[in-house]
Amino acid sequence: VTTGKLATSSVTSVKVGTEFTTANALTAAATIDVDYTAAQVFTLTPNANTTLNITNAVIGVSKVIVVTGAGGTNTVGFTVGGSAGTFNRISGTYDDTAAAKNFIQITCVGATEFWYTISQIAT
């Protein structure tokens, strides 16, 4: 590239990393690693209170975690690299009603700081 710029439409989804174009089903457990470099969308149906431990976070990158309620009173929380970190909830609450879909969008804004929202399908 002689102009120092990419040509219009030269970067397509085929050319970006899998961390931006794939989904990853997480396995239910008390603590689950969510590797920021593994996928763009993560899915989970928890079977107990669950801590989602963010690993390999990249500042400025957002991820989606779709958590399907298990029909109990389970909760979902966050850590980063096994430590507390700062998780700023913008809006919404987790709903563990059976089959309820919780759309969690989380953005890394610092090495250990994240902002997130939780939404459900409108009724």
Where do the language-model regions lie?
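Intrinsically disordered, low-complexity regions of eukaryotic proteins
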Residues: 21, 35-37, 97-98, 115
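Generic detection of short hydrophobic beta-strand segments and adjacent strand-loop junctions
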Residues: 26, 30-34, 52, 76
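Glycine-centered loop/turn motifs
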Residues: 9, 25-31, 60-62, 101-102
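N-terminal beta-hairpin/loop module of FHA
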Residues: 29-45
